[in-house]
Amino acid sequence: MAEFPASLLILNGKSTDNLPLREAIMLLREEGMTIHVRVTWEKGDAVRFVEEARKLGVATVIAGGGDGTINEVSTALIQCEGDDIPALGILPLGTANDFATSVGIPEALDKALKLAIAGNAIAIDMAQVNKQTCFINMATGGFGTRITTETPEKLKAALGGVSYIIHGLMRMDTLQPDRCEIRGENFHWQGDALVIGIGNGRQAGGGQQLCPNALINDGLLQLRIFTGDEIIPTLVSTLKSDEDNPNIIEGASSWFDIQAPHEITFNLDGEPLSGQNFHIEILPAALRCRLPPDCPLLR
């Protein structure tokens, strides 16, 4: 095997007992690859490990976990200054793995690990909310956010992405739309939103294609709003084709401003952020990510 620069894997603490992962790492090490492994225990560990990765001079920092882990590692990488910033590698080990799935990361651990180490590094966008919090995949608001943040961990562990749908059906009687106003470049909408998706990536909530036209290197955010007064009829209508769906509002812009008369919550790659005012903007070519050559989210 050709020689590859060293990499550092930042592994979510929930995946430490993953025997196939241990075996995959050992095999690659036996083939001559240098792979450092660090395990997260609490919030902020990823920043510290990225700093260590730079001191070690690795070419890639691999995020081993779900969308939240990818978010934390990618956010730490874009905060780095200077040259020779490591590329991001992705090893999907979470419940839903929405970003990894949509960009075409292999499900097989050994193949995903090889791609994370040796794949082509391509500049991709990220998004930033209120000049502080970032997301690499999607910001979701409304019905979808409450479901993904409230779904019990045991249900997610047992059923994966399907758990979000099941929990949503159980909660329909208590969920109401969010009234808000959204502005962007050549875009303005005001009304009641059941679901809001602002995507750099395409899917969230365990495989739901909220922003099917999103690309991760076009300098734009894709917006999709699901409107309606009643949740069940709206969800039924969303199963139809987009052309027949009167409850979908779409837009594209490098930024969006959201204002609400009451507190609403957005889910940023799994992390909730509540408030009444949100400014969401794209950060073009914010970091390099090792992706498959046929990644469908590249223009």
UniProtKB/Swiss-Prot annotation:
- List the active-site residues: E271 (proton acceptor)
Location relative to the cell: Cytoplasm
The residues listed in the UniProt record as binding ATP, with positions renumbered to this chain, are T40, G66, D67, G68, T69, I70, N71, E72, T95
One MF annotation (Gene Ontology) recorded for this entry: lipid kinase activity
| Gene Ontology CC entries for this record | cytoplasm; plasma membrane
- Whether Transferase counts among this entry's keywords is yes
For this protein, the Enzyme Commission number is 2.7.1.-
What keywords were assigned to this record? Answer: ATP-binding, Cytoplasm, Kinase, Lipid biosynthesis, Lipid metabolism, Magnesium, Metal-binding, Nucleotide-binding, Phospholipid biosynthesis, Phospholipid metabolism, Transferase
Q: Which cofactor does it need?
A: Mg(2+); Ca(2+)
Signal peptide (UniProt feature, chain positions): none
Task: Indicate the segments forming the DAGKc domain, all copies.
Answer: 2-133
Q: Which residues bind Mg(2+)?
A: L215, D218, L220
Look up keyword Lipid metabolism and say if it applies: yes
Q: How is the cofactor bound?
A: Binds 1 Mg(2+) ion per subunit. Ca(2+) may be able to substitute.
Checking SUPFAM superfamilies in the record gives: NAD kinase/diacylglycerol kinase-like
Can you supply a Gene Ontology BP term from the record? phospholipid biosynthetic process
* Gene3D superfamilies, per the entry: 2.60.200.40, Probable inorganic polyphosphate/atp-NAD kinase, domain 1 (3.40.50.10330)
Similarity annotation = Belongs to the diacylglycerol/lipid kinase family. YegS lipid kinase subfamily.
HAMAP family, per database record: YegS (MF_01377)
Tell me, what does this protein do in biology?
Answer: Probably phosphorylates lipids; the in vivo substrate is unknown.
PANTHER family assigned to the protein according to its UniProt record, in alphabetical order = LIPID KINASE YEGS, SPHINGOSINE KINASE
- NCBIfam families membership: lip_kinase_YegS (TIGR03702), PRK13054.1 (NF009602), YegS/Rv2252/BmrU family lipid kinase (TIGR00147)
Q: What is this protein called?
A: Probable lipid kinase YegS
